[in-house]
Amino acid sequence: MLYVPADRPDLAAVLAGKRDLGVCCIAVCLEDAVRPDNRKRAAMALCRTLEQLSEAPRRIFVRPADSDALDWLLEYLPVDKIAGFILPKATVQTIHLWTEKSYGLHTILPILESRDALDVVGRRELAQACAAHPPVIPGARIGANDLFSLLGGLRRPLGRTIYETPVGRVIDGLLEAFCAQGVRLCAPVSDRIGDLVNLQREVVEDIHRGLFAKTAIHPSQVHAIWNSYQPAPVEVEEARLILEPDAPAVFGLNGDMLEPACHGEWARRLLQRNTLHRSAGMIPTVSCG
């Protein structure tokens, strides 16, 4: 998924697939990426653009600024042209509210970037709220920049991954709460656009934690992210052997102990990632589920 501001001058070309951005999903942002005094104008322009769109080669998600903006979009936006809505600064209340407002007809992707995400009880309640609305909510994404701001006005340091900052501990806490409810989490963005080396390091850490999708905020990040998702050949070999119907209960390979009862889900997810990588070439997936 690639985030683009709703007031981007070439938005029509982006949504029509006339810009080679290397992604299969676009998130059109009407929240923080657009000045408050320009959001209504941008929303109206987005409606006109979608109405004139004959076909959309990429899935399109829209990120409204708030619940009032969602109401306006549900009334005027050609919702048959979009895949769903992104819920910024999700709370338990807004998760239930947005699901109700959309009548369960549109996918809702909550962003975990409110104060609730910093609290153990709050994280558990957020996870329970998301789990209450399958398949409307296929997963949730972690919002890094807002969490940095909430932790005393911090910003991601240069030359570090997010796991080398206080937000890393928040992510681990969110994983515990959401995995307990069976809700998949998508990895946070990186606003250090020029630092592709540490972006790739971060994606590896995302994968090690079970975070599958990584959103890009600039086209230059797409290839670096997608290349990092390619499994190593030795991992693919191990995963296939683990999932063999006649695999032993425990066996060794490449100096590792493999146990299908424990490693089966890891193997299934890795082979899914391998299949997506091979079939899509350089086009990343947005799936959280």
Put a short name on every predicted segment.
Residues M1-G289:
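Expand to "…catalyze enediolate/carbanion chemistry for C-C bond making/breaking, isomerization
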